[in-house]
Amino acid sequence: MGVVRAARQVGLPVAISFTVETDGHLPDGTPLASAIQQVDADDGGPDWYLVNCAHPTHIEPGLTGHGGWRERIAGLLPNASTLTHAELDAAEELDEGDPAELAAACDRLRPLLPSLSIVGGCCGTDARHVAALWGVPGPG
């Protein structure tokens, strides 16, 4: 990937983030493991991978299998909603989901992602969701 090569040329750390559909595969059908392994093989890989713009219940099915590829994922930036990307694109109102449910779903992924150190939010999230993800009191 060009971004990895460019960052390496100037000595910058670099991360690549993938999104997944409800089955844990990339939108083109590529399994998450295969995508990470392919980028690592082609370019030596970024310093970190993240998964973003998908609810944790959509990410979880993609975290199966063996190998060190799951250790390469350092971050999750999940959507608040459990709706599919197509449903979100067609929605006329923001689906904010449930902050506690989002946090619980992310917590279930922690044992599968031993390098997880970046947790934030993507579509539909706000300070309430991030507070729940980090287990701190939310705005009030």
Residue ranges of model-derived segments:
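Domain-level signal for soluble alpha/beta catalytic cores
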Residues: 1-140
